[in-house]
Structure formats: C-alpha cells, structure tokens
Amino acid sequence: MELGVPLPRRPVPGSYGVPFVSAVRDRLDFYYLQGQDKYFESRAERYGSTVVRINVPPGPFMARDPRVVALLDAKSFPVLFDVAKVEKRDVFTGTFMPSTSLTGGYRVCAYLDPSEPNHAKIKQLLLSLLVSRKDAFVPVFRSNFGALLDTVESQLASGGGKSDFTALNDATSFEFIGEAYFGVRPSASSSLGTGGPTKAALWLLWQLAPLTTLGLPMIIEDPLLHTLPLPPFLISSDYKALYAYFAAAASQALDAAEGLGLSREEACHNLLFATVFNSYGGFKLLLPQILSRVAQAGEKLHERLAAEIRSAVADAGGNVTLAALEKMELTRSVVWEALRLDPPVRFQYGRAKADLEIESHDASFAIKKGEMLFGYQPCATRDPRVFGATAREFVGDRFVGEEGRKLLQYVYWSNGRETENPSVDNKQCPGKNLVVLVGRLLLVELFLRYDTFTAEAGKKVVITGVTKASTSAVNRTA
C-alpha cells in the first residue's frame, strides 16, 4: 500500500461456526490436530486476512464465550497495548479467568484495568521493588547461575555426557528471584525448603491448565485440563506455604505497600503472583529458549559473543557491571531476538471500549464496542512484512546498529513495544528491563566460562558438551 493512500475498508472475515460444537472442534485443532502456529496461520490463509474472526481455547465449558477478533500481524497487534481503546479488566488469561481462590480471594494486578484504583498502587509497588533491589540483580544472578554451571560441568564429567538445563534452571531461577527481590533464598524458608519450585509449578498449572498441554493422550487430557477448572482446594496447602515465605521475606516491601494505601494481605498476594507467575514463570520458559537458540546458532555466533563479552568485562577491570553490559550490543540483540521468536507470553487480549477502526497492512476493519480482541504474538513478531525473508529465522545480530534498532518497536513480548517503558498507567510488564538484563547475564556467564557449547532442544534443553574458555577476561567472584 502506497504511503498516504487510504486502506480499503473490509468487514472482518472469518466464522465462529456452530455454537459449542465448533468451539470444541477448534480447541482440538489448536492443541492436538494442528498446533498453535498452524491453527492461526491456516485461518489467516483461509480468509485472506490477518484480522479474522475465530474461536480461541479453552472454549466450553471453561469459557463463556470463545469468540474473538484475532490480530495476526505486526501492524494491527499494538492496539492491544492502547488502554484508551481496549479494556484490560479480567482478560489476562483471555476468555476465562482462574478462580480468585488461587490468589487469596483477590483480583491481582494482572487482572486489573489501569482505570481501577488499585492498579496504580500495586504497579507502583512492583516498580519500586525493582528499583530498590537493582544492585542485587547482577551478583545474585552470578552466584546462583555460577553454581548451576558448576553442576552442569559435574554432570557432564560424571559419565552420562548430558546435563538437563531445563530442570536445573527451574530450581535455580526460583532461588535467584527470591534472593534478588527480597534478599532471602526460598530454600532457607521453613515453609518451603527445597520444595518451592514444585509448589510454584503446581500453582501455575492450576491457573494455566486450560491453556496447557502436557503431552497426554487427547482423550484423557482434553476433558481433564480444558473442560472444567482444576479444584483450587487441591493445592491450597502449597499456596499457603508460598504465601508464608512472601509474608516473611517481603516484609520491607509490605511496609512500603502500606505507605501506598494497600493492605499487607493484598500486597502479599500481589507480590507472590508477580514473583511466581510473571517472573518465575517467565524465566522457566525464556532462559532455556535463549540457550537453545544460541546452541543451534553455532560456533561463529559463539565466537562473536565471547569476544564481545570478554572485551567489555576486561574494560571494566574484570568485573561484570551494568555499564559493561550496556556495551554488549550483540549480546543484547541475541536476547531480543530470542524474545521476538519465543515470547514467554504468546497471547494478549483486550475488549474494545468503543467502536474503533483497526488497520492491518492491507485493510481497515470496523470493530464494535465490547468485542474481544486477541493477539497471537508469534504471528505479529514473525511478520515477514516487517522482518523480511528471515522473519522466522534466528538472526542473532538482527537488532545491532541503527537500522537494527529501528525494528525494536516491533518486539512486543512485554505487552508493549520494546521502545517503551512500563508505568502505572499501562499494562506493560514492570520487569521488562530486568528480563532483558537476566537474559544477557545468562550469556555472560556462559561465554566467560566457555568458548562454545552444544545442546539438544526438545521439550527440555539438555547441554551435551562445553569447551572451556581458552582465555579469561574476568576475575570471577562468588
């Protein structure tokens, strides 16, 4: 479409099919018969549009109404970030909402629209916590993940020749987040001990089961996970144990919450949710994905990363500092590229606050007030109209240089553009900058130790070999 030429206006194509029956059939396509990417791509192809009416899971009986207008390109997708146009009340998980029994009876911040009074208070609490703990992130990460890599080396040397990074990361990320945010390792808590990651994973599953597949046979898994909610009482003891840790470890943050006008109880449930669901749930997915992508990219990228990382650390006197990290342009680009291809949260939702117009690359569409808008992020962030012929490929240096940085506005993983920042007035992830920092720190730890490494990627990421660094540019600290 030429610049300045109005886009043709079209009705939104697509079909919701026969009530109930089509929604169930579409759910089976989504999880078992087609898979997520093919589910959306096939419907965009069928109707010749990247804005299309479809059903989304979980459907009956979990969701009252599975009908959405799907936004499947980089141009239409960002309307979901505009809280002047879309309402974000109770749409964090989409067309269904988990029971508030799983969050202490509270609608936590993720489910609040910015227009609701407590949204600003809770988000300010989260933003302030991150600022207050900023000096802890680098040393605490290095301590925890340095120990993880020690374990990797031990397991590789033990004769098996493999080390399950995914499993190690599940345990290490939980320890790291608790210590980084609150100064107290969860494993030191009498309520959790070493069982924290398991309790957290169960609590996450109880909320995300309708959007999850565990690899069980369809005839068993679909009615078990996608039809009716899992009973909250089955994990109430696990949640109480998690809550007890936060009530004790986060005492300073809870004091600050009272100063913002929040009760300690509501603040504690929100800190638990933000830490376990948002941060831990995100790192469980993201860090293995970064490792997998970099392993598959091969030795040439490894050489470039090692050279950049070691040079920046050497210039900082052998220390890993925030200033040194800012000099690592390729390292940061690799993290952004992993987030572009494999966003930890793939779905975004919003309900139209009024009649509005949405534009794709090719047409304009009228949306009625109250319609549910849905974005499948991988379609948007792999849009070939923006990222060209390599849109589906991992290109580590994609965001290097002035031209590369222009593409950052199309990186949406944080529920906002990468060029924007979270505030109390929007729904962008409060930990946006921390996530990119942690991704870089993982690469720094890897390439200060190793010249290269190999890994197998499937449902788990398994490290199969490491080549120790031939030179060292860092004075490693505990």
Swiss-Prot record:
Highest taxon of source: Eukaryota
Alphabetically ordered keywords of this record: Fatty acid biosynthesis, Fatty acid metabolism, Heme, Iron, Lipid biosynthesis, Lipid metabolism, Lyase, Metal-binding, Oxylipin biosynthesis
MF GO annotations: allene oxide synthase activity; heme binding; iron ion binding; monooxygenase activity; oxidoreductase activity, acting on paired donors, with incorporation or reduction of molecular oxygen
GO biological process: fatty acid biosynthetic process; oxylipin biosynthetic process
Family: Belongs to the cytochrome P450 family.
PANTHER family: ALLENE OXIDE SYNTHASE 2 (PTHR24286:SF302), CYTOCHROME P450 26 (PTHR24286)
Task performed by this protein: Involved in the biosynthesis of jasmonic acid, a growth regulator that is implicated also as a signaling molecule in plant defense. Converts 13-hydroperoxylinolenic acid to 12,13-epoxylinolenic acid.
Record's protein name: Allene oxide synthase 2
Name of the gene this protein is made from: CYP74A2
